Amino acid sequence: MRNTKEDGYYLGIDIGSVSTNLVLMDTDGKIAKKIYLRTGGQPIQSLIKGLKELTAGQRLPDIKGAGATGSGRELAGVIAGADIIKNEITTHAIAAQNVVPDVKTIIEIGGQDSKIIILKNGVVYDFAMNTVCAAGTGSFLDRQAARLGVP
């Protein structure tokens, strides 16, 4: 993990009910390393395991900033010393616009809830979430993916 332009990385953490995701990105926005783990109802242990895997026994590189999102964002932010903690509506909107700049609608089916986000002029205009704990929507998709061998 050597950043040739300028030493330093940014750490992104997303702790959800199904998965824990960590990404280490250099100052140019290039992904240096990413980790995907099953949360398994143990968000703290999953985060610690992810941080250990991210460094793979090496000294942690210079982290210029860290951010946390997901249903476990507050917990992850405190444990990792995040500089910023953002809700999933905001992070989905920003991420989607990085991939598709003129995106207008985002639909997300998660382990706990489902969301629809409407953007106007690059800003979240409206959003809605289901009112019942997902009724297993994300968990259902997760099980089907496992049956198909999709990580």
Residue ranges of predicted features:
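Short acidic, glycine/serine/threonine-rich loops at helix termini
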Residues: 24-26, 77-81, 116-122, 128-130, ...
